[in-house]
Amino acid sequence: MKLTLLIGILLIGIGVVLNTRQQWVTVFYGVPVWKNSSVQAFCMTPTTRLWATTNSIPDDHDYTEVPLNITEPFEAWADRNPLVAQAGSNIHLLFEQTLKPCVKLSPLCIKMSCVELNSSEPTTTPKSTTASTTNITASTTTLPCVQNKTSTVLESCNETIIEKELNEEPASNCTFAMAGYVRDQKKKYSVVWNDAEIMCKKGNNSNRECYMIHCNDSVIKEACDKTYWDELRLRYCAPAGFALLKCNDYDYAGFKTNCSNVSVVHCTNLINTTVTTGLLLNGSYSENRTQIWQKHRVSNDSVLVLFNKHYNLTVTCKRPGNKTVLPVTIMAGLVFHSQRYNTRLRQAWCHFQGNWRGAWKEVKNEIVKLPKDRYQGTNDTEEIYLQRLFGDPEAANLWFNCQGEFFYCKMDWFLNYLNNRTVDPDHNPCNGTKGKGKAPGPCAQRTYVACHIRSVINDWYTLSRKTYAPPREGHLQCTSTVTGMSVELNYNSKNRTNVTLSPQIETIWAAELGRYKLVEITPIGFAPTEVRRYTGGHDRTKRVPFVLGFLGFLGAAGTAMGAAATALTVQSQHLLAGILQQQKNLLAAVEAQQQMLKLTIWGVKNLNARVTALEKYLEDQARLNAWGCAWKQVCHTTVPWQWNNRTPDWNNMTWLEWERQISYLEGNITTQLEEARAQEEKNLDAYQKLSSWSDFWSWFDFSKWLNILKIGFLDVLGIIGLRLLYTVYSCIARVRQGYSPLSPQIHIHPWKGQPDNAEGPGEGGDKRKNSSEPWQKESGTAEWKSNWCKRLTNWCSISSIWLYNSCLTLLVHLRSAFQYIQYGLGELKAAAQEAVVALARLAQNAGYQIWLACRSAYRAIINSPRRVRQGLEGILN
């Protein structure tokens, strides 16, 4: 019992230790994670005309979509979708570059004397026409268009009848005087203006004082050539390192917080560049159903209605007549294009074709189906009316550009046709539909509308006005598909809902690009693991060639973290391969068009997209390098994971979900990684200072020992050489000083016959002491030198003996250490042999036991039928 309790406690302790094991921050490179971005996208187009080739790169026709198993929020309007905002800015630049408005100089901001031009046709209306127009009713039989009897589809119109019902454009011939080539002399000029483009003081029609409209804020800079572009479609593409997400949900209506059918693409579909107010022309998105998009899902001030393509709605606009343009040279370098003198233009007009009433009826049915939190108007579709707005000409009319000319079309007749009633623009009933001149009145129903062409317009993107050259010569015509309309939903006290055409241009790009979302790929992720970085070595991961694209990389966004982490090497290759491939394609296109791109604004944007991609790639690599993780897909660190309450579910959680949970921790994690990297660099620096002693196995390098012995041998030779040099120097010094005999050890006797104490003649006193004094001095000096030489010799001998003994002792110790090492290696070898023998015996015993168990199981299986038979026999007997 006690043993069982101890085993249980031991197992519980082991489990606690395993569960509380320290985790460390691990850096993963190549995780499929992204964040919203507002980076500048670039454009592609299949069009090969001049504008397209100078502003966009050729289309690669790659429409690959990779589905993602994730949910993502989407928003269609420009204030929350940077791609939609970019479209508005870029299309405005298209207008500026191609239509070339004239600005900054005001030669025509002067007083002009104007005379109204007479009509080129009789002002009286023929009787046949009068008879057909005086009693116009709501029935379709009075319309100048043929209608299919079995449906409400408008098939064709009689252009002659339409043109007879339209008035001519009112125009005036204006004369003015200004300095020309000679500055001190004024010259008279004559220019024809449309009456809508001049401001005149009250007076008779024969002679009026007029000024150009918006004279104070719209001026002319240069002679502006008349240019235009045909229908142009382009695609927005994400720079390298970025991507476009697309929402494919069926119920998407411009706003959704959890779009589930998401795919990733490199470029959008082809979108149109037609700018209009009210109606959406030539849209790229159309389905077999009517859709209503509300801004931010709840706004009634900005509503997008997408028509059902089943109704085949189109509009054809024409400017009849063979208009001619007369160039007027105003001054040196400035030519103003005027209409030819004494001519009046016929009005332009637009004819609406298709089942418009059926489409409008379906729109009303969809409006009343809106949830109550999004629509509080009437549920009676008969009380829902389509109307126009009042105010600036661009807002009050259908405004669009047709072959470079700006059309302003008054929609009253067509709106009366759609609403199937005869009222004035204020919804007041009126009797009769006869208007001014030949034209029908505002209460008439028509499937066509009258249009004006103007040269002075309000800029739709900036708060300014632009002046363009007068309309071009010849016949103008363009046909467009109507895919939707921009409206406002207004309610009033009469239990009526007014659907008002809106001039908001951004609705066009919301319809075209609202399903797309520009994101920045952030391939660096953090997660806790139980592996700590080994700081003993620094080896660099080998880089491999890249062969796949980044769409496949993002395709793993919906997989679990564990499955994605096991393929990080391949995913990082996909990411970098996509970056490199996109850069290669973009660079090739830029190089092919470098001469044409160098002066265009969109060309600069394309180059900027390339620079942005390079900056992003270098930024990611710089971050990895700062953490010591350069060129690594999985990089373990020495930073402990301090947030134990935040751990990933590797089998069920995606990287995107995990990154969103720890996004607020990223700042702390990166700071700790940088500090750990700095400390590691300091440790590495100190470690390298001791690198010559760091490797234990370097002691067994024979070449190092030879170097040490060589140094010792050279030291001994140096000492011996110094000793020899000193000896030679001593000998030479003695020779140079001369020979000095040593003092005698035995007294030298004087000459014979002379006693010791004998005195010579004339000598007196004892001379013995004085005669021996020089000998004593000489003897003392020689003795000192002899002693010094002996001591030097002894010191050299002792030094040699000490050096010899030291070397001998060192060799003895080395021999002893080598013997110990040899003994240790022998013991290790013996232990290893014993361990191998023990493992072999253990394996043999285990194999034998396994064989016995298998044999027993085999015999049991084989003997089972016999034992069953024996048991049955015993039971039956």
UniProtKB/Swiss-Prot annotation:
Residues 409-451 are annotated as: V4. The record marks 543-544 as: Cleavage. Residues 114-173 are annotated as: V1. Glycans are attached at residues 36, 69, 118, 135, 148, 158, 173, 204, 216, 258, 261, 272, 282, 288, 300, 312, 322, 379, 420, 431, 495, 498, 652, 668. Keywords: Apoptosis, Cleavage on pair of basic residues, Coiled coil, Disulfide bond, Fusion of virus membrane with host membrane, Glycoprotein, Host cell membrane, Host endosome, Host membrane, Host-virus interaction, Membrane, Signal, Transmembrane, Transmembrane helix, Viral attachment to host cell, Viral envelope protein, Viral penetration into host cytoplasm, Virion, Virus entry into host cell. Residues 20-707 are extracellular. The lineage of its organism: Viruses, Riboviria, Pararnavirae, Artverviricota, Revtraviricetes. Specific enzymatic cleavages in vivo yield mature proteins. Envelope glycoproteins are synthesized as an inactive precursor that is heavily N-glycosylated and processed likely by host cell furin in the Golgi to yield the mature SU and TM proteins. The cleavage site between SU and TM requires the minimal sequence [KR]-X-[KR]-R. This is Envelope glycoprotein gp160. The chain crosses the membrane at residues 708-728. Residues 317-349 are annotated as: V3. Some of the most genetically diverse regions of the viral genome are present in Env. They are called variable regions 1 through 5 (V1 through V5). The YXXL motif is involved in determining the exact site of viral release at the surface of infected mononuclear cells and promotes endocytosis. Residues 494-501 are annotated as: V5. GO terms for molecular function: structural molecule activity. Residues 174-215 are annotated as: V2. Disulfide bonds join 102-224, 109-215, 114-174, 237-267, 247-259, 317-350, 402-478, 409-451. The gene is env. It comes from Simian immunodeficiency virus agm.vervet (isolate AGM3). It holds the Pfam family GP41. A motif (YXXL motif) lies at residues 739-742. Residues 668-692 form a coiled coil.
